UniProtKB/Swiss-Prot annotation:
Involved in pyrimidine base degradation. Catalyzes physiologically the reduction of uracil to 5,6-dihydrouracil (DHU) by using NADH as a specific cosubstrate. It also catalyzes the reverse reaction and the reduction of thymine to 5,6-dihydrothymine (DHT). The keyword Signal does not apply. It catalyses: 5,6-dihydrouracil + NAD(+) = uracil + NADH + H(+); 5,6-dihydrothymine + NAD(+) = thymine + NADH + H(+). Gene3D superfamilies: Alpha-helical ferredoxin, FAD/NAD(P)-binding domain. The keyword Oxidoreductase applies. It is an enzyme of class 1 (oxidoreductase). Heterotetramer of 2 PreA and 2 PreT subunits. This is NAD-dependent dihydropyrimidine dehydrogenase subunit PreT. InterPro entries: DPD_II (IPR028261), FAD/NAD-bd_sf (IPR036188), FAD/NAD-binding_dom (IPR023753), Helical_ferredxn (IPR009051). Belongs to the NADH dehydrogenase family. Coiled coil: none annotated. It comes from Salmonella typhimurium (strain LT2 / SGSC1412 / ATCC 700720).
Amino acid sequence: MPQQNYLDELTPGFTPLLAIKEASRCLLCHDAPCSQACPAQTDPGKFIRSIYFRNFKGAAETIRENNALGAVCARVCPTEKLCQRGCTRSGIDKPIDIARLQRFITDFEQQTAMQIYQPGSKTRGKVAIIGAGPAGLQASVTLTHLGYDVTIYEKQPQPGGWLRHGIPAFRLPQSVLDQEIARIVEMGVNIKCNCEVGGSLSLAQLKAEYRAVLMTVGMSCGSGLPLFEQASHVEIAVDFLQRARQADGDISVPRSALIIGGGDVAMDVASTLKILGCPSVTCVAREELAEFPASEKEFTSTQALGVSIIDGFTPVAVSGNKVTFHHVRHSGELTLEAENIILAVGQHARLDTFAEIKAQHNIIDTHNYQTDDPAIFAAGDIVKGDKTVVYAVKTGKEAAQAIHHYLEEACSC
């Protein structure tokens, strides 16, 4: 098996012939379950039908009508839990590979320089968005389509949020994200980077300048465990992934690594370590396989790289480079030793700089995405719901519609 490069995509894309062949397996359901199961309403049933009839531009238009990050979602969305899970073809052999078909179309869109999005009219006034992650980017597109002049404030040097700083390049190449964002900027969305709201620029200042403000700050801070507070050779998963991404994978790796956690972030850490040359990588999760939080796609690809995954154990003691685990249901005990220990046990947002907003456990309580302040809305990871990219797209789109409804009502008073 050839060595996987950090910058090369792990999963190959479809050629036109393979895409048409895969689309031809579709049963062309009248009321397609796959379309009903997509949180972003990307409508796989419709774009697969277009591919089947060789109408690639029509397929791209269907995707972009509902999902400004179609190329991103095609690569990182847990489709086996969503649209592919609803595929009727599963009852015959296996579901349609919806993710790769969507990736083929969005790649074709870029390769042929399709112009699907048009600049917005900017006739309805100004709206500010805090955070240029998936929720903020999608909201900016929806608001621009509705006629608003949108400015996104992003604290990092480049937009993208977790898409840029956390997801490994072999899952999401930077060029793909750059192309998605360039398309959004061409619509007329203004993105101001290196501009953190909550410091010299306050939420109150934005409220004074804009008709509405949407908060889409992500959960970019990694969580730790009290057990490991005094331990050496311990790193938070978010920090490790950011280091690897910023260096294009050019970082040193240990001879052995122990990852604690069982979600997609843990799988990304484990896969990154193996791809960068770490000989021994073990991942231990407290969840048992039947309830594993990682997507099947991530879990399978991580195992294929040679990562050892142990389920059902939780850490109870640490001594130097050794960690002792107890089984969550049985009396079993396990002790593992590794040069480095990486904690992938959750993430949280930094909301303490937004004193005006009430938040509990890093979640902002909203009613239809509206906070206690009627002119301030929230979407993405900081509202209740799933923490995947496709759900961020969903909340960004719905929050934009809620803002539009609020401003329309304000004008009619």
